[in-house]
Design a protein with these regions (language model features):
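Sec-dependent N-terminal signal peptides
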Residues: 9-19
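Positively charged n-region of N-terminal signal peptides that target proteins for export
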Residues: 1-10
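Extreme N-terminus of proteins, especially the signal/transit-peptide cleavage junction
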Residues: 5, 19-24
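Soluble extramembrane regions of membrane proteins in the secretory/endomembrane system
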Residues: 23-219
Length: 219
């Protein structure tokens, strides 16, 4: 059986769930609430510790409406550079900056009724960011998706509602995307769990971390 270490932000302790016997150890890292500049150093420390301790995987349990683009970008960079397998478990929602963090992980799992997307950048007053900022976030999303083998058109559409496309190529087949939630002009793309699976943004569904690990054959 695997052992799950729960690592919580700004709290210096690790809660360990023991099994009678286990051969693999996994860190669980909650990403909740507003993503701010206090989060990247924490994530970097967790990854560094996991690498030094030969941890088998890190599961980022994500439930957030987003936050700062610069903070999310730092977290994304740290996850992409991780030598330990990284898994996003979207426990309800990964909106805005949460979507970027999710896409940076090697594997993405979502609960039933989950949501990912709507990642346009806004300023502190909630107004849409400048074209420069939108362009930056759009290409951050696209390049991250591409690096993980996910569809960069979908990722771009999560940031920029003005993008126009009617087809995607998945598994060498050209398919319509008219059924994607938020696809209509003037709206950002957001994907439900079923849609994220269909368009290869998510790898699977799970109702808890144990089922995520079971799906990946952790023992």
């Amino acid at each position: 059986m695997y052992e799950i270490n729960i690592v919580k932000k700004l709290i210096v302790f690790i809660s360990i769930v023991f099994s009678i016997a286990y051969s693999e150890i996994v860190y669980r890292v909650p990403i909740e609430g507003v993503i701010d500049l206090g989060l990247p150093p924490y994530v970097k420390r967790v990854i560094k510790e996991a690498e030094a301790s030969n941890i088998d995987a890190i599961v980022f349990e994500i439930n957030t409406f987003g936050g700062r683009v610069d903070a999310a970008t730092q977290i994304k960079d740290a996850i992409l550079s991780s030598e330990v397998q990284t898994i996003a478990f979207i426990n309800r929602r990964a909106i805005s900056a949460g979507a970027l963090i999710s896409l940076s992980c090697e594997k993405v799992f979502m609960t039933g009724g989950g949501l990912i997307g709507a990642a346009t950048a806004v300023d502190m007053s909630g107004k849409k960011g400048s074209e420069k900022v939108i362009s930056f976030m759009r290409e951050e999303m696209a390049s991250t998706a591409e690096q993980r083998g996910r569809n960069k058109k979908i990722a771009r559409g999560m940031v920029d509602e003005e993008l126009s496309f009617t087809h995607l190529v998945l598994n060498q087949d050209s398919i319509l995307v008219e059924d994607i939630e938020g696809r209509k002009e003037g709206k950002l793309i957001s994907l439900t769990t079923d849609q994220a699976l269909k368009y290869e943004i998510a790898d699977g569904t799970a109702e808890n971390i144990n089922s995520v690990l079971d799906s990946l054959d952790y023992k």
